Design a protein with these regions (language model features):
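Claisen-condensing/thiolase-fold acyl-transfer catalytic domains that form or cleave C-C bonds
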Residues: 2, 20, 27-28, 51-104, ...
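Generic N-terminal amphipathic, Lys/Arg-enriched alpha-helix
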Residues: 2-18
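Acidic/polar N-terminal loop/beta-strand segments that form early-domain functional surfaces
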Residues: 9-12, 47-52
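Short catalytic helix/loop segments, enriched in acidic residues and glycine
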Residues: 19-37
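ACP-dependent fatty acid/polyketide chain-elongation machinery
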Residues: 37, 152, 208-211
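Short acidic capping loops at alpha-helix termini that bridge into adjacent secondary structure
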Residues: 40-46, 157-158, 251-255, 278-279
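Flexible glycine-/small-residue-enriched beta->alpha junction loops
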Residues: 103-152
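Glycine-rich, mobile lid/loop segments that gate access to catalytic sites or pores
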Residues: 134-184
């Protein structure tokens, strides 16, 4: 296996001007990611993107995003109808072939295009039983919260303490807020925003030439649970636990974990699934509870994990999720090597 590292990460601001297209969000973001390590678009040998046509309301809308990649002469390109973290996994696999040394990964999503994210995400559900009921992701997250409380003895106070630890807010004040969908309140759910992000992957010794402290991908894996929520225990995530095992999370001490949790109960489920000790700092960036750019949040978690390595950390976990109630999970272990 080739050693592959993240050498650069860039993210667009969560607040975008009205009418901003995903291509225009991506253009400066990709340029920033490449320029940070002295690369241009001509240096890229493979590119893979992640986005969702359901958010834009059109077919093959990801094709126009390629204008932001600006690959000339043309290079191999791929796309996943998923969060950009899965595009990163595909790029990692592509670099293992050995004929390409530099890969560009990017993703984008706009939550501000009319239809609410709660309505749009019903399309990912079973089309016969759940989707017609309008079982939105917040309502399903509330069911998961109930399952977590029933199984583990945790309470709404535990949810509020997660939020307070990130915002500096008062737990009692948070608990006094009205329910969004009981037992969840508005602060328990990350706000949907527009977003874009880009990551540069480089294989072998070239990564050391481009970056003072590359984040080496020591392990990466993704697994999925049954699609139908009623066929699994929502208080646990077997797919996240298996992905963590295959990625080698337990093979060393983890200093920081960036978890793709857009609802507070998800963070508790993931911390248990990855067997994170109390010494592990979870989501110092704020995580998906601070902002949830759909199709980008998972890639941002890995990007934030890279930033931790760049800042001197030794071993960090980046995590991404997809589907209702943490149905599919990707775990990436990053290491800084002296």
């Amino acid at each position: 296996m080739r050693d592959i590292a993240i050498v650069s990460f860039a993210q667009a601001p969560s607040e975008q001007p009205p009418g901003q297209t995903e291509t225009l969000m991506l253009l400066p973001t990709i340029t920033e990611a490449l320029a940070a390590v002295g690369l241009t678009r001509r240096d890229v040998g493979f590119t893979c993107s992640g986005s969702a046509d359901y958010l834009t309301g059109g077919t093959f809308t990801f094709v126009q995003m390629l204008e932001a990649a600006g690959a000339w002469p043309p290079i191999p390109e791929s796309h996943v109808e998923m969060d950009g973290a899965w595009a990163l996994h595909e790029a990692w696999v592509r670099l293992q072939h050995g004929d390409v040394d530099v890969a560009l990964v990017f993703s984008s999503g706009r939550a501000s295009l009319g239809t609410s994210l709660r309505e749009t995400l019903t399309f990912q559900l079973d089309p016969y039983y759940l989707a017609p009921l309008g079982a939105d992701f917040v309502s399903l997250a509330a069911l998961q919260a109930d399952a977590v409380m029933a199984r583990t003895g945790r309470t709404e106070r535990d949810f509020a303490e997660i939020v307070a630890s990130r915002t500096g807010g008062d737990v009692e004040t948070l608990l006094a807020e009205p329910y969004l969908v009981a037992p969840l309140r508005a602060h328990d759910v990350g706000p949907p925003v527009d977003g874009a992000a880009a990551v540069v992957l480089v294989a072998g010794d070239r990564a050391k030439d481009l970056c003072e402290r590359p984040a080496w991908i020591a392990g990466i894996d993704h697994r999925a649970d049954p699609h139908y929520p009623g066929m699994r225990d929502l208080a646990v995530s077997r797919s996240a636990a298996l992905a963590a095992e295959k990625a080698g999370v337990a093979q060393g001490d983890v200093e920081v974990a960036e978890l793709h949790a857009v609802c507070t109960p998800e963070e508790l489920v993931l911390a248990d699934a990855l067997s994170l000790s109390d010494k592990v700092e979870v989501n110092p960036s704020g995580g998906g509870l601070a902002a949830n750019p759909m199709m980008v949040t998972g890639l941002v978690r890995i990007g934030e994990a890279f930033r931790q390595i760049a800042a001197g950390r030794g071993r960090v976990v980046g995590h991404a999720s997809s589907g209702p109630c943490l149905q599919q999970n990707l775990v990436c272990v990053l290491e800084g090597r002296n």
